[in-house]
Amino acid sequence: MTETSPPPVLDTAQARVLGCLIEKEATTPDAYPLTVNAAQVAANQKTAREPVLNLQTGVVHHALRQLETLGLVRQQFSSRAERYEHRLGSVLDLTRQQVALIGLLLLRGAQTLGELYARSERLARFNDADDMRHHLDRLIQRGLAAQLPRASGQREDRYAHLLSGELDVEALQAAAARAAPSARSGSDTSDLEARMQALEATVVELQEALAAVQARLDAAGA
């Protein structure tokens, strides 16, 4: 793909899984690349996801293989399991900051500049909000993101990715209105999300360790 190539069109599962790979590369590098099981756990997280999904293992595996076909994901083999890493930055010639922004938009839908800035801390470094706006403008110029028109009562611009085709602006505005009453402060939310992600990564590592032990026991008993 080049800068003039149209962006890929991803379905819901593909978009969620790609976003998870981007996130976990930065937040849990020791567990990255991800196994199918780890990708499923990440995709179905109850925190830092909009909407919350319940993807089955087969759906996640299929999404990974489709992303691999598109060149956005690469499979790596280890002694224990298949592992997958994203290639979004190299395939679309994006900076780390731009990849982080796409990842956040894939995982949490349309967001304001302030929300993106608060949530990006663990994914990439931005000098300030103006620096982030510069990277968002670049994504918009590339046709990878869009700035949404403000709905009635909204005071800030919102941004969304375009990797899943044309946007349903009315649906995005309705989702933003539903989310507004339950919004928590950025610092409290970021702290909670960090703890939850660390716990979820630990659970995945324990599950994989148990699976490896079970495989050795099965082999010994064969």
UniProtKB/Swiss-Prot annotation:
Point out the coiled-coil segments of this chain.
Answer: none
Read off the Gene3D superfamilies from this record. Winged helix-like DNA-binding domain superfamily/Winged helix DNA-binding domain
Similarity field: Belongs to the UPF0502 family.
Quote the protein name from its UniProt record.
Answer: UPF0502 protein XAC4278
Species of provenance: Xanthomonas axonopodis pv. citri (strain 306)
